[in-house]
Amino acid sequence: MQTSPLLTQLMEALRCLPGVGPKSAQRMAFTLLQRDRSGGMRLAQALTRAMSEIGHCADCRTFTEQDVCNICSNPRRQENGQICVVESPADIYAIEQTGQFPGRYFVLMGHLSPLDGIGPDDIGLDRLEQRLASEKISELILATNPTVEGEATANYIAELCAEAGVEASRIAHGVPVGGELEMVDGTTLSHSLAGRHKIIF
């Protein structure tokens, strides 16, 4: 079937989004054109501005339109002395929603993966080393994902911390709240048992 070249181009562009296949892209394109053209225009304008104006924070490497993001420039956060290392900016949003972390962050934008040719410098560890040497950091919290690559990355960074004389800690992994033990995989259960804590009354 012959369709409008612009419509085809729109559907192809929408497929760059994760989880969006041909059918989903077609549905999105038709919905915007049929029912919400003003929404489509707002989306286009927001995308254009974001793609051209959003860069990386000079300190933590998260997304921001400023030289230094709001978290890194916050005096209270600076005084705290804790830095949480995460794999992506999305992880910062997840942690910030808990309201439990008062420090700053460092975003790797990935993890070590020798098989894919991703080494320490590719995920900004040279910059992290500079910060370990020049800043007064009380604790580096390693919040990389609980995958083989995430664990390897955390161990590598922990070695950098040891060399710099900075305390390093790893976030706990274990049974999710509301979960049932029989549904938990063996590796997660092993982490839960190893990371158990005493109940004090």
UniProtKB/Swiss-Prot annotation:
UniProt record, GO biological process: DNA recombination; DNA repair
Tagged with keyword Acetylation: no
Pfam families with a match to the protein in the record: RecR_C (PF21175), RecR_HhH (PF21176), RecR_ZnF (PF02132), Toprim_4 (PF13662)
Toprim domain ranges (all copies): 81-176
Metal-binding in keyword set: yes
GO molecular-function terms, A-Z: DNA binding; zinc ion binding
SUPFAM superfamilies: Recombination protein RecR (SSF111304)
UniProt KW keywords: DNA damage, DNA recombination, DNA repair, Metal-binding, Zinc, Zinc-finger
Disulfide bonds: none
Zinc fingers (C4-type), renumbered ranges: 57-72
The protein's role, per its UniProt record: May play a role in DNA repair. It seems to be involved in an RecBC-independent recombinational process of DNA repair. It may act with RecF and RecO.
Entry similarity comment: Belongs to the RecR family.
Protein name, as recorded: Recombination protein RecR
